[in-house]
Swiss-Prot record:
Protein name: Elongation factor P
Gene3D superfamilies in the cross-refs: 2.30.30.30, Nucleic acid-binding proteins
Pathway entry: Protein biosynthesis; polypeptide chain elongation
SMART domains: EFP, Elong-fact-P_C
GO MF terms, alphabetically ordered: translation elongation factor activity
Keywords attached to this entry: Cytoplasm, Elongation factor, Protein biosynthesis
Cellular localization per UniProt: Cytoplasm
Species of provenance: Paenarthrobacter aurescens (strain TC1)
GO cellular component: cytoplasm
Single GO BP term: peptide biosynthetic process
First and last residue of the signal peptide: none
Name of the gene this protein is made from: efp
Amino acid sequence: MATTNDIKNGTVLKLEGQLWNIIEFQHVKPGKGGAFVRTKMRNVMSGKVVDKTFNAGLKIETATVDRRDYQYLYQDGEDFVFMDTQDYDQITVSGATVGDATNFMLENQMVNIAIHEGTPLYIELPPSVVLEITYTEPGLQGDRSSAGTKPATVETGYEIQVPLFVEQGTKVKVDTRDGSYLGRVND
C-alpha cells in the first residue's frame, strides 16, 4: 500500500474500481493547515481528465504496471500494431488508447507502452521527435501580424506553428507533450 506522498507522473492509481494515470502532480504545504497533493489524472478506460486533491500521507492503492519498449509498425484501420523489441511479439492497441500520440508517431519509431494485466493503458513517447515539414506557406519577413510564426503540416498530418524562415522539406524537432516547435534539425 502506497501513500499520496509516493505519487509522481506516470503513477497508476486504483480508485473506486477504476484505473487513473497521474498526468501532473504538486505537493503543497501551506503555511496554515495540513499538506496535500494536487493531481491531474486521466481515466485509463474513458480518457476523461479530472483534477483531484488528496491529503498528504493518505493510503492509496497503486496498480502494477509493466512498461516495455515497443516499435510502432503500422496502422490497421482504427488500431495500431506494435512489436515488442525483446521477444518480437506483436500487440494491437486501439486508437483511443494511443490518443494524441498519433500526431507524433512514425513507422519504426520506438515508444514505451504501459500494460496492466495484459491490457495496454497508454503510450509514452520520447520528450521530442524529429519530423519533416510536408506543407507550409512561404513566410514573408515583412508580412507580420503576429510574433513571426506560421502554420506548418508535418509528415504525420499534424499542424504546428513554426517560425517564418522554416520551409517545406525542413526537418524540425517537436515537443511531444504540447506539439510546440523546438528547433530545426540539420542532417
